[in-house]
Structure formats: structure tokens, C-alpha cells
């Protein structure tokens, strides 16, 4: 119990023979250098936890298969497992990412980008999944902000470019078309970012996005 046991496990990760660890988490590709470093750190953490933190009878029960001690590679640190992100507050009131103040977004596209950055930061500071409840409801106000910008631009185009009196009905129709394209681009941003971002724990974020809004919601059309 007092002997360091990590050498074989670590070298097994380096030469791709430690299949127990390499195949344990399908979200982690142990052949990628950044992920491999996380797995190596995990083996060191497990060794310390087994020798210094977890009671001997629990370790014995785990090794015998009587129980499974989940996430042993993270237990030595006071980290969160899973969480429900308060995205609505972070977008409405601004947040801090990597020590930098992020103001409330002024468009749907920027709101989508900031959302993915928040997801990446949360994923890098914990080791479990994360959920966002009602993302359509949360992002809807930023659709309206984008619509307002497009409507103002279209009215200005009618007056200054085409030299005509603004037709608000037509202007709103054109503005909504531009908003719909921005929505498609923003959702694509979220999809691509979530699936391609690499966090500090060597994997893409594990995220659940739940969509829900009430029919009488103020931003029902935008949602």
C-alpha cells in the first residue's frame, strides 16, 4: 500500500498497452498528447488516493470487484462532478472568463459564442457533465437584439441607399430573414464548438442542452 505503483501504468499509456485506462472513457482518445497527459495525471492521482486517502478496506473492495470506486483519478482534488450552468445570469449580467470581464452579448451570434466559451471553462474546471435548462428561452432575448439591429439597418438602407420612405412591413420581413440566417449560423457555432473544443481534462465537453419555453413567454416568437 505504501509503494509507488504508477510506473507500469504510466509507461503502459505511453506505449499504448494500458488498455484498462485507454478504453475506460470513450470520450478520451489516449493517443492524443493532451489527453495522454491527463490520463498520466490521473494515474498519479489514483496512486496517491489509494495510498494516502481512501481507506484500505475500500481499496480492497474495489480491487476485488465487490464495489467500484468511481472517478478515483479525481478524488484527491476538491473538484465538482456535474453541474447545472446558470447561463441566463451569465449572459444577462456578464461574466468573467480567464480573468477577463465579458459583457452581456449584443447579438445572437455573440451570445452563442460566449455560451460555448462558458461551457469550455466549466468543463475545464470539473470532471463530469453539465446541463443548460431552457437554452432556447435563454438565447431568445439575443435574437430580438439582432432583429432590432437588422431592422434599423434595413430602414436606413431604404432611406439612404434606395431613396424611398421606409416601408416598415417590408423592413421587418427582410430583418427576420437576416435573423433566421444568423440563428442558423449561431446554432452551427454551438454545435461545432462543443464537438471540437478540447478542455484541460483531455476531452470535449459533455453537455446536455434542454429546450423549453412557455407559450406565453415574452420572447416566444424568438425562441
Regions found by a protein language model. Give the residues of each.
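Catalytic alpha/beta active-site cores
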Residues: 1-223
Amino acid at each position: 500500500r505504501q509503494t509507488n505503483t504508477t510506473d507500469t501504468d504510466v509507461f503502459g499509456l505511453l506505449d499504448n498497452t494500458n488498455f484498462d485506462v485507454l478504453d475506460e472513457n470513450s470520450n478520451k482518445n489516449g493517443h492524443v498528447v493532451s489527453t495522454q497527459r491527463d490520463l498520466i495525471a490521473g494515474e498519479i492521482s489514483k496512486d496517491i488516493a489509494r495510498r494516502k486517502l481512501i481507506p484500505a478496506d475500500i481499496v480492497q473492495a474495489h480491487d476485488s470487484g465487490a464495489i467500484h470506486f468511481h472517478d478515483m483519478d479525481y478524488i484527491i482534488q476538491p473538484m465538482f462532478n456535474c453541474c447545472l450552468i446558470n447561463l441566463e445570469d451569465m449572459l444577462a449580467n456578464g461574466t468573467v472568463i480567464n480573468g477577463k470581464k465579458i459583457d452581456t452579448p449584443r447579438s445572437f451570434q455573440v451570445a452563442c459564442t460566449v455560451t460555448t466559451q462558458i461551457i469550455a471553462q466549466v468543463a475545464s474546471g470539473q470532471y463530469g457533465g453539465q446541463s443548460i435548462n431552457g437554452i432556447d428561452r435563454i438565447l431568445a432575448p439575443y435574437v430580438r437584439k439582432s432583429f432590432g439591429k437588422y431592422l434599423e439597418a434595413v430602414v436606413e438602407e431604404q432611406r439612404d441607399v434606395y431613396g424611398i420612405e421606409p416601408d416598415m412591413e417590408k423592413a421587418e420581413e427582410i430583418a427576420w430573414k437576416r435573423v433566421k440566417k444568423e440563428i442558423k449560423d449561431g446554432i452551427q457555432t454551438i454545435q461545432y464548438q462543443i464537438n471540437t473544443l478540447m478542455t484541460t481534462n483531455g476531452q470535449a465537453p459533455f453537455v446536455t442542452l434542454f429546450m423549453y419555453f412557455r407559450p406565453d413567454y415574452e420572447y416566444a416568437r424568438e425562441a
